[in-house]
Amino acid sequence: MYKYRQFGDRYVLSIDNHEEIVSAIKAFCEEKHITIGTVSGIGAVSEATLRFLDPAIKNYVDGVFTEQMEISNLIGNISTKDGELYLHIHATFGRRDYTCIGGHLMSAVLNGACELVVEDFGKGTVGRKFDPETGLNLYDFSVTEA
């Protein structure tokens, strides 16, 4: 599913071709017991599901894109919600015509390479709690352990 090398509190991670990226990141974090940190990377995909929050209705709209695209930016944070690992990842994808699409990354199927850096902030965590005003799962700093 992936290969990696550790450098201090950071991991350089390469996900295997044709794997689903979000699932691979989650599996890696679970294997390494990472409950607070960040992830960033680049790569290429053949399919991606992105999510956009419409603040007027406090509801998400998903879009599925099935085309070869470059990951021009993938960035996110790692925390927990209700004691479970919670990934909040955004991505920007470059299309063949040099336009870009982006949003909250729900899933993406790798087609080429996916090279990531995962930083582990160490023991503890920051939780998440639903905020009815925004419709978002926001940081909950009262949670300190996963």
Tell me the role of every PLM-derived stretch:
Residues M1-H88, T92-A146:
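N-terminal intrinsically disordered, cationic/polar leader segments
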